[in-house]
Amino acid sequence: MVMSRGRIPRLGAAVLVALTTAAAACGADSQGLVVSFYTPATDGATFTAIAQRCNQQFGGRFTIAQVSLPRSPNEQRLQLARRLTGNDRTLDVMALDVVWTAEFAEAGWALPLSDDPAGLAENDAVADTLPGPLATAGWNHKLYAAPVTTNTQLLWYRPDLVNSPPTDWNAMIAEAARLHAAGEPSWIAVQANQGEGLVVWFNTLLVSAGGSVLSEDGRHVTLTDTPAHRAATVSALQILKSVATTPGADPSITRTEEGSARLAFEQGKAALEVNWPFVFASMLENAVKGGVPFLPLNRIPQLAGSINDIGTFTPSDEQFRIAYDASQQVFGFAPYPAVAPGQPAKVTIGGLNLAVAKTTRHRAEAFEAVRCLRDQHNQRYVSLEGGLPAVRASLYSDPQFQAKYPMHAIIRQQLTDAAVRPATPVYQALSIRLAAVLSPITEIDPESTADELAAQAQKAIDGMGLLP
């Protein structure tokens, strides 16, 4: 899942998307050879821009036309699946959520990278790619996609309320209780509604505790199969329950998602938050607009004019520095809290991978398009202009990247030692069943919930459908 937000002005983005979608519809008859490039609508502007950059490099040999899928990941997956099962020959390159790799590979919908006629796809996908993103691109020891964007959650906190950021979840819960007793904002902002955000949170806690939902091959449930695995599952569940029931907890915690967590922090209700890096840009933008009571950036004269005509924060480099420097007194970031003290968390990552559809009529050009879309220059553009963390390790040493992402060192480390969600062709069913058992987190009984999670996970991999 990708939770970052783009930075291209929305009006221009809409025009670009419309033009490239029209080009894809026209097809090869009017445009020459066209490679379609299906991406989530949320990042359509960014992907349109890098497609156009590639088209300039190709010099007319062929063109890439970005086409927007729906905004909802579930609807994106369904549309691609329908096109592939219907043998849609206009489908060439697909931006796949990182959890779809096994499903698309097992179904034969995505070509293995070894099918690249030029023989370059596998090496290109591996070279300079961080280990976490790369781990999401394979199935059964074979690469089926090339990472193009990634994401990891951090701890965000109030330095004016918290002396030092908690390093583990026990310290998080203790700090929230201390703040509540002192009459200060005490919520821990999380994603705990019945959905993918809750599964991501649970998976991070589980893997950080030494456990896993499934075996590496996706064939066996490993939540309670050994005493050590059961202990890890119970530990993760205890943390979920404790966060929800500690004194001063968010009373609406069972309905929270990424957006409501961000808002709780910006409104001054939460002093601690685990969330994706999009909250950094959101905090600065809304503070400049006067919407963050504890961070009145709207009162800084040098930031005048940094909000454009459509309400987006588009600062100069100097304005960004001023806003960021001012924010540090009340808005900090730190590594994701550990489960075991002294052992860094293994944080579940999101992102997108590029795969070539089995239905493509232009195999060589589609694989070449993938290489261009994720090359060093376009990775830099995606990160700096699109607000999507890079998958290429070398970019984390780029001074401009570091300026745009002050938390770059934490992001890189967490992407190097990351957790991934269970690799299985039935991930959709597995996720739905896990979320149903975990929700509401206020009613978790760690021991019995561990058993129910294992039972529902087994039903998912046995092909018993989506409903618990």
Curated annotation (Swiss-Prot):
Deletion phenotype, per the entry, is: Mutants show no growth on trehalose as the sole carbon and energy source, but grow normally on glucose. They secrete substantial amounts of trehalose during growth on glycerol.
Q: Could you list the residue ranges that cross the membrane?
A: none
User: Which positions form S-S bridges?
Assistant: 54-372
Return the Pfam families for the record. SBP_bac_1 (PF01547)
Kindly state which keywords UniProt assigns to this record, in alphabetical order. Cell inner membrane, Cell membrane, Disulfide bond, Lipoprotein, Membrane, Palmitate, Signal, Sugar transport, Transport
Q: Where does it localize?
A: Cell inner membrane
One GO biological process term? trehalose transport
What start and end residues bound the annotated signal peptide?
Answer: 1-25
What is the top-level taxon of the source organism?
Bacteria
Q: Where is the lipid attached (N-palmitoyl cysteine)?
A: 26
Membrane topology (UniProt): Lipid-anchor
Q: How is it used?
A: Being a receptor for trehalose, which is essential for the survival and virulence of M.tuberculosis, this protein is a potential target for antitubercular drug design.
Q: Where does alpha,alpha-trehalose bind?
A: 97, 151, 276, 278, 351, 421
Where is a lipid covalently linked (S-diacylglycerol cysteine)?
26
Q: Name one GO molecular function term.
A: trehalose transmembrane transporter activity
**Which GO cellular component does the record give, naming just one?**
plasma membrane
This molecule's function is given as: Part of the ABC transporter complex LpqY-SugA-SugB-SugC, which is highly specific for uptake of trehalose. Involved in the recycling of extracellular trehalose released from trehalose-containing molecules synthesized by M.tuberculosis. Trehalose uptake is essential for virulence. No binding affinity for maltose.
Protein family (similarity comment): Belongs to the bacterial solute-binding protein 1 family.
Q: How does it assemble?
A: Monomer. The complex is composed of two ATP-binding proteins (SugC), two transmembrane proteins (SugA and SugB) and a solute-binding protein (LpqY).
Q: Per its record, how is this protein called by name?
A: Trehalose-binding lipoprotein LpqY
What broad taxonomic lineage does this protein's source fall under?
Bacteria, Bacillati, Actinomycetota, Actinomycetes, Mycobacteriales
